[in-house]
Amino acid sequence: MTKRFWNIDLEEMMRAGVHFGHGTRKWNPRMAPYISAKRKGIHIINLTRTARFLSEACDLVFDAASRGKHFLIVGTKNKAADLVSRAAIRARCHYVNKKWLGGMLTNWSTTEKRLHKFRDLRTEQKTEGLNRLPKRDAAVLKRQFSHLETYLGGIKYMTGLPDIVIIIDQQEEYTALRECITLGIPTISLIDTNSNPDLADISIPANDDAIASIRFILNKLVFAICEGRSSYIQNS
C-alpha cells in the first residue's frame, strides 16, 4: 500500500476539537499511548498519533477505492447521523445512520430478504401501485415501507457484504464492530479515550462527541475514497 500525503493539519484538528477526550474518570487504560495530557478533568488526545492513524486509514480507503471496493459507514448517534449520510452520499458509500439492526451483516440472508422487500415496496410507491390497493392494505404496506426506509435506506443498493466498514464512535456501534470482526471485514474506527484501541484494524483516536471533530475525520476519509474512485475510473 502506497503512502500518500493527505494534508492532515494539527492546527486544523485543534480548531475542530479533535484533541478533547472524555473525563479522566471515564477512560480505557489501553488508550494511555494515545493520550498526551490531562486538562481540567479531561484527557487530551495526542494529535500526532491521530494524524498518523488517520493518514493510514486514508491510504487504506484510497487503495481499496482504486480497486473498486465497497464501503459501509456506520454512525447512528444524533450528532453523527447527518454527517454520516452526507459523507456516504458524497463518496458513493453505503451507510447506516439510524439504528444498527442486530445481524445486519452476520445474518446477511435475512437482511437481503428485507432489502428485496424494501425495493419492491419502493417500486410500488414510485408507480403509485400502493394507491390501487384497498386503503387498509395500502396503509399497512406504507408503514412497512416507511420503517424499512428509515433503517435500510442507506444500504438499499447493497448487494453483498462491504469490503471495508468505517465506524463513527466504536462504543456506540460495538455490535456492528463485533459483526465485522466475526466476518473478517476490515474496520476503521473513530475511538475516544473510553474505547479499546485494539479491536478495529485501524483505530483513529479522536473526539467522538463534537460535530466538528467527526466532520474533520469523515471529510479526510471521504476525500481519499473519492480520489481512489477517480483513479479506478481512469484505469478502467
Swiss-Prot record:
It comes from the Eukaryota. The keyword Ribosomal protein applies. It is found in: Plastid, Chloroplast. The keyword Plastid applies. One of its GO terms (molecular function) is structural constituent of ribosome. InterPro entries: Ribosomal_uS2, Ribosomal_uS2_bac/mit/plastid, Ribosomal_uS2_CS, Ribosomal_uS2_flav_dom_sf. GO terms for cellular component: chloroplast; mitochondrial small ribosomal subunit. Keywords: Chloroplast, Plastid, Ribonucleoprotein, Ribosomal protein. GO terms for biological process: translation. Pfam families: Ribosomal_S2 (PF00318). Its main location: plastid. Belongs to the universal ribosomal protein uS2 family. PANTHER family: 30S RIBOSOMAL PROTEIN S2 PROKARYOTIC AND ORGANELLAR, SMALL RIBOSOMAL SUBUNIT PROTEIN US2M. This is Small ribosomal subunit protein uS2c. It comes from Aethionema cordifolium.
